Every structure is written in C-alpha cells, then in structure tokens.
UniProtKB/Swiss-Prot annotation:
Expression sites (tissue/organ): High expression in liver and kidney. Lower expression in brain.
Organism encoding this protein: Rattus norvegicus
Family: Belongs to the cytochrome P450 family.
Name of this chain's protein: Cytochrome P450 4F6
Catalytic activity, reaction form: an organic molecule + reduced [NADPH--hemoprotein reductase] + O2 = an alcohol + oxidized [NADPH--hemoprotein reductase] + H2O + H(+)
Lineage summary: Eukaryota, Metazoa, Chordata, Craniata, Vertebrata
Top-rank EC class of the record's enzyme: oxidoreductase
CDD domains membership: CYP4F (cd20679)
Subcellular location(s) per record: Endoplasmic reticulum membrane; Microsome membrane
Any matching Pfam family: p450
GO annotation, biological process: leukotriene metabolic process
Gene: Cyp4f6
Record-listed E.C. numbers: 1.14.14.1
Length: 537
C-alpha cells in the first residue's frame, strides 16, 4: 500500500488513505487562503500609507471606541475635520480600514463615478432589504438604471404642483394640534414627534391618496413604519445580531417581520386595487377619473410608467419603490425641519425676517395657503433652510465600496476593495471650505452675493448619478411647512441645549424640544439688530 513518509518531520510513517489526502488537501487550501489574505491585507496597508490617520487608542479596537453615536462622537468627527481636511484613514478593529472623505475635491471622483465603479456599501443598508426590497435605495446595476428612468417622471414639476395643497393640509392639521396645546400660552414640544407624523401624513396622501388621520389617531400602518425605523437603528448597535438567522430568533426580529408584513400588506392592497381599476377602465378612462381629483399619486405614476420598449414595473417593484419613498421621505424631512426651527429659534433676527417675507408674500390672501409659484418667491427663507441643511444635514454620510482603483486629483490612489465614507457632515463643517463652519449664517447662500465654492461643498441630498431623486419634493414640503409655521407661531429655544444623536438620520437625544407660542400671544419685541447689519461669510 502507498505510504507517505513523514519521518523527517518526526511524525513517523502515515498511510496515505483518501481521507488523509483529502484532509491534507483541505488544510493546504485553507493555509493558502490565509497566506493570500495576509499578503492582500499587507499590500493594501502599504498602499493606504499615503493617507494620514489619527492616533489609535487601541491596536485591537482601532478607532472604534472614538466613533460614538452621541454628541461627543459628533464633536470628534468635527475635530477630525479640522485636523485632516481632505481625507483620512480610520480603523474599525485591527483589520478593517475605512477612508473618510471630507473635501469636495476628493469626494468628486466617487460621487461622479458610475454606480458600477463606486456602488453602495451594503453592510448596514442590508438590514433594510426585507422592508424595502429592490427599490432605488437598495438596487444596483441595470435594475437601478431602469427604475431610476421610470421613476423620474414621478418627481416632475407637473406632478409635484398638485402635492403642495396636500402639504398645506397636513401642516394645518399639525398647527391645529399646536393651537390646542398652546391655548394657555407657550408649550414645550418635541419637534421630531410632531413633524414626523406630519410628514408621514403627507406621504401617505401623496403616494397612496390615503388619509389615515395619523396626526390625530393611531394608524397600524404608520405605527409599523415607525417601529421598523426604530428596530433598524437598534440592530445597528448590536453587531452580534448582524447575522439574519440569529436576529430573527429574537423578539426584535419577530417584531420586525410582523411590522414588515403590516407595511407590505397595506401597499400590496392599494396596488392590487389600483391595478384592477386600471385594467378595467383602460388608461384613458383611468386618467380622466384621476384628473377629477386633480392629483395623480405616486402609485398611479408607477403603474403607468413604461420604458422605450413598453416594459413597466411589476407589482413587487412598485411596492419596493413606494416603501422606499415612505422610508426615505419622512425621517429625513422631519429631521431637516426640526433643526431648521431650532436654528431659527436660536436666531430670532433671522426668524423674524423670514416671517416678514412670508407675510409680504401672502398679504391680503385668504385663506393663508402656500402655492407652487410661491416657493420661488421666498429667497431669504430658502437661504435659512440651506444654511441649516449645511449645519445639521439630515443624512450624515454616504458609504461607497470601490470596485476599482480610484485616482484622486492629487495623484493618490484609493485601492480597489476599500470602503469609503463620504462624510456630508465633514464636508459641511470643513473650515477650509466654509469659514467659521459652526456659525449659523444664512448669507453664505445669498444669491446676490454668490461665493466661489465647489458645487460639491453643499451636498445634503448627495450628488452625481445617485443623488436624491426626491429632493425637489422634500424642499417643497419644507418650504410650505416652515412658511406656515412662522406665519402662525413664534419658535423659542428650550432651556436645555439639545445633544445631537447620529442614527439613520440626525436626531437629538431625548427629542428636539422647543417652545412654541401663537403669534397672537407674543407681546415682547425681540431685538432684530442684525437685520440692518447682516453678517457676511
């Protein structure tokens, strides 16, 4: 019988049975893989040496202990931006490098690259997959291109115009609640709580033409969406539950599945009913019927969408895009509006100037309602919105995985396979891009005094081919809500300064609380000294 002599290794003689050979071959393969990984890791580390990095508190944890989801973590990110003004390297543990980009010049090659060159990094986005399916947020490649082309008409001005009335109604409902709460004077309100319900109310009407009255009463569908968002944030903090099969064994995993079922069943029912009506009536009669309501909602547009080959979206695709719109449209807008009101509460001179601009626009108009054409007639209010989006961007970062080497303008190369974090917060707070970046100064965005800045210096909605498709929708809703709020209420800062809390969007620990007073009860005159002498950036 064949024997393999291992006597020279001090192991004596071993009969080379097939199992022994298989074991030896497997061990050799594993060893080869380990050696290949070590070589690849070492080579990658050598290529990353051109990028600076802050001192590591621990060789094992890397910079992980400094990356906190609280105010101190936000201050650390700002500190990094002051010391590393274009790009720097961070380590999550001993073997996982991440490049953080904080300057327009270095983010340009990534944001302007095709989705194939710099696709989204899906480690954390993957948690959303069971809820959002293959919508725009989650899809890639040809499927993303196809969906993006078919969805673009849904955000055309002609469609968005009809949504402005919906925005007005939802804001009016929120303000009616505020009037009741402030009947005896000022009230201390959590902006996130109230504005989130208002944005969900608007979205449900714009997407499904459905009024759940969620601002005044409980809605199973709205409760499920809020629970899904909360569970995803909670799971992000529990790395041992990143594996699906473990997560779905937990109580949170079962709650997540149940909430997904509630959301999917609601969306599926609307799509089935609308598809049946379309098939029964035909396109022409369907459009005539919808024209009587003066609103073509998001589901209608997707049902009617066809590409150049006559191919439309399946019901599963439509559900994914509707759920993605609900997810992406409520929290981000609520965060933006909450921080805008916070900044205006801290700067009453700007708040009053916005209020006078709105009053002048709506003078002698009954009822007091913002119309589509009004949105372009509020320049100072728009400046205040943009400056708040710079200072407190709702989405703090975008992650990309390089599928090939990325050459930066200065000649340095980001090696293939590395994760890049485009820090929107870092770019917006970069002192080499924005002088005095922590100061709230709307005049940075004065259209009559344009600054020489890169178009990528201000990216609250991202940029490039994968920018936010709903940014005009979001800005329209923000303008309507802000204009009507300032017309009816004075917003004052709370006694306690909020502590920022980065999650899926930028929140505040324990809520963002402000004091709200109906304007009819405001008797004291605030000093508007800066109106006559506005600061310059």
């Amino acid at each position: 019988m064949l024997q393999l002599s291992l006597s020279r290794l001090g192991m004596g003689s071993l009969t080379a049975s097939p199992w022994h050979l298989l074991l030896l071959g497997g061990a050799s393969w594993i060893l080869a893989r380990i050696l290949a990984w070590i070589y690849t890791f070492y080579d990658n580390c050598c290529r990353l040496r051109c990028f600076p990095q802050p001192p590591k508190p621990s060789w094992f944890w890397g910079h992980l202990t400094l990356m906190k989801n609280n105010e101190e973590g936000m201050q650390f990110i700002a500190h990094l931006g002051r010391n590393f003004r274009d790009i720097h390297l961070s380590w999550v543990g001993p073997v996982y490098p991440i490049l953080r980009l904080v300057h327009p010049n270095v983010i340009a090659p990534l944001l302007q690259a095709s989705a194939a060159v710099a696709p989204k990094e899906m480690t954390l986005y993957g948690f959303l997959k069971p809820w959002l399916g293959d919508g725009l947020l989650m899809s890639a490649g040809e499927k993303w291109n196809h969906h993006r082309r078919l969805l673009t008409p849904a955000f055309h001005f002609d469609i968005l115009k009809s949504y402005v009335k919906i925005f007005n109604k939802s804001v009016n409902t929120m303000h009616a609640k505020w009037q009741r709460l402030t009947a005896k004077g000022s009230a201390r309100l959590d902006m996130f709580e109230h504005i989130s319900l208002m944005t969900l109310d608007s979205l449900q009407k714009c997407i499904f033409s459905f009024d759940s009255n969620c601002q005044e009463s409980n809605s199973e569908y709205i409760a499920a969406i809020l629970e899904l968002s909360s569970l995803i944030v909670k799971r992000q903090r529990q790395p041992f539950l990143y594996l699906d099969f473990l997560y779905y064994l937990t109580a949170d995993g079962r709650r997540f599945r149940k909430a997904c079922d509630v959301v999917h069943n609601f969306t599926d029912a609307v799509i089935r009913e609308r598809r049946s009506t379309l098939n029964t009536q035909g396109v022409d009669e369907f459009l005539k019927a919808r024209a009587k309501t003066k609103t073509l909602d998001f589901i209608d547009v997707l049902l009617l969408a066809k590409d150049e080959h006559g191919k439309g979206l399946s019901d599963v695709d439509i559900r994914a895009e509707a759920d993605t719109f609900m997810f992406g449209g409520h929290d981000t807008t609520a965060s933006a509006l909450s921080w805008i009101l916070y900044n205006l509460a801290r700067h009453p001179e700007y708040q009053e100037r916005c209020r006078q601009e709105v009053r002048e626009l709506l003078r002698d108009r009954e009822p007091e309602e913002i119309e589509w054409d009004d949105l372009a007639q509020l320049p100072f209010l728009t400046m205040c919105i943009k400056e708040s989006l710079r200072l407190h961007p709702p989405v703090l970062l975008i992650s990309r995985c390089c599928s090939q080497d990325i050459v930066l303008p200065d000649g340095r190369v980001i090696p293939k396979g590395n994760i890049c974090v485009i820090s929107i917060f870092g770019v917006h707070h970069n002192p080499s891009v924005w002088p005095d970046p922590e100061v709230y100064n709307p005049f940075r965005f004065d259209p009559e005094n344009p600054q020489k800045r890169s178009p990528l210096a201000f990216i609250p909605f991202s940029a490039g081919p994968r920018n936010c498709i709903g940014q005009t929708f979001a800005m329209s809703e923000i303008k309507v809500a802000l204009a009507l709020t300032l017309l009816r209420f004075c917003v004052l800062p709370d006694d306690k300064e909020p502590r920022r809390k980065p999650e899926l969007i930028l929140r505040a620990e324990g809520g963002l609380w402000l004091r709200v007073e109906p304007l009819s009860t405001v008797t004291s005159q605030l000093p508007w000294d800066l109106l006559a002498h506005p600061p310059t950036s």
